[in-house]
């Protein structure tokens, strides 16, 4: 961390604390997520899903950009250097007397659905979508904190007590870890309501109260849904019939299209719940799609790539130090679980092969194509072999310095047979 100066503390969680840092190389400000856990080897770092996921998902305009990963083998400390955002959604709405305009709400929710569509198409689900993990910078929204993410192809059951209680889907509460990527849409629906009303939708004080709060609003589900959940839980349960007050009774300032999408996102049955790519086509986002289409047309006329990226030239650039040298490089499911085509999909996220004490710096890679989208022939991203840079090569002003630790560049994620 000798290349960064601590400016102040942003926040702290169970497993990490986040600091505002200034780079001594480029003068830019970053968010440093310092892990509280100590790591004994590169293999342990390899197994961190958060790093694997961010490497696969970056770059995307609605996913937090990972700038650098710094691992100190001697102390076992690990830090993730990410782009610095202005605030999270919780901070945005906290203390507000009046809700945001529906246009602003629509703009933010469209970007949140874009981020979820991107991660789901790339075989990952977040599992902890909540206001604190959704970051804002001016009008750009980005999903962050992938510490709880999983591969959609990994074997169930998953961890039961995942996600923050208020945003936890019924299948997470009522089964022994048998849930899918659809849980992210439930959580996003809860965030949707909270942005619009400035109040949490289901503020349960414990697990039982959480289910009760859900039933108070939505009503108890059909018996066939409860029966399906019971098959995935050792303990039996029954609930008294509740009709539910309904979401419209809790709000008066939301349009019919807004309420329609909100209901679709918090459908009790995950099989009936809307998927992210379907949400993006909902009538509520009609104006957003038109705006995006016009912007795409302008980019094509100007000769720019078809996939616009949020305009952040500084935070989207990475500087890789090699003892005095700086190199600047640009960073660039259907309703049910997607059907397999061709070779079997990977069951877990790919591991990054590293060696020695390293500073892992991101660098440009082509925009990732979906592992679930058409035209992939069922193939998944692969990793190129690592290129290691010996630390022995120094420029003249540094000959009297001690040998630096070995540095490795992370490989670009590429797809065989892709575009």
UniProtKB/Swiss-Prot annotation:
Identify the tissues in which this protein is expressed.
Expressed in heart, brain, lung, kidney, and pancreas, and at very low levels in placenta, liver and skeletal muscle. Detected in retina.
Q: Which UniProt keywords apply?
A: ATP-binding, Cell projection, Cytoplasm, Kinase, Magnesium, Metal-binding, Nucleotide-binding, Nucleus, Phosphoprotein, Serine/threonine-protein kinase, Transferase
Cofactor list: Mg(2+)
MF term (GO), any = protein serine/threonine kinase activity
Q: How is it modified after translation?
A: Autophosphorylated.
Report the active site residues.
128 (proton acceptor)
One Gene Ontology cellular component term attached to this UniProt record is: ciliary base
Catalytic class of the enzyme: transferase
Residues bound to ATP: 10-18, 33
Q: What does this protein do?
A: Able to phosphorylate several exogenous substrates and to undergo autophosphorylation. Negatively regulates cilium length in a cAMP and mTORC1 signaling-dependent manner.
| Protein name, per record | MAPK/MAK/MRK overlapping kinase
What organism is this sequence from? Answer: Homo sapiens
